[in-house]
Amino acid sequence: MKQGIHPNYREVNVTCSCGNKFVTKSAMEKENFNIEVCSLCHPFYTGTQKIVDTTGRVDKFNNKFGNLFKR
């Protein structure tokens, strides 16, 4: 690797909006970085993910436009 062309690699303090804090390494200039979602509060990891039921939407569409496509 060439010398002097790579950015400095330093520790960065990451703070989530849920209050979780951790330290990671990055080439970014700032020492502190704020995020909105982390693995402790993301719905996929917490199991609070909602499944959208589209059946009602399909029925509503068919009631409104169903007779337009019949032959």
Curated annotation (Swiss-Prot):
Its cofactor is Zn(2+). One of its GO terms (molecular function) is rRNA binding. Pfam families: Ribosomal_L31. The keyword Metal-binding applies. The keyword Ribosomal protein applies. Keywords: Metal-binding, Ribonucleoprotein, Ribosomal protein, RNA-binding, rRNA-binding, Zinc. Zn(2+) binds at C16, C18, C38, C41. One of its GO terms (cellular component) is ribosome. Binds 1 zinc ion per subunit. GO terms for biological process: translation. Binds the 23S rRNA. Part of the 50S ribosomal subunit. Belongs to the bacterial ribosomal protein bL31 family. Type A subfamily. HAMAP family: Ribosomal_bL31_1 (MF_00501). This is Large ribosomal subunit protein bL31. It comes from Neisseria gonorrhoeae (strain ATCC 700825 / FA 1090).
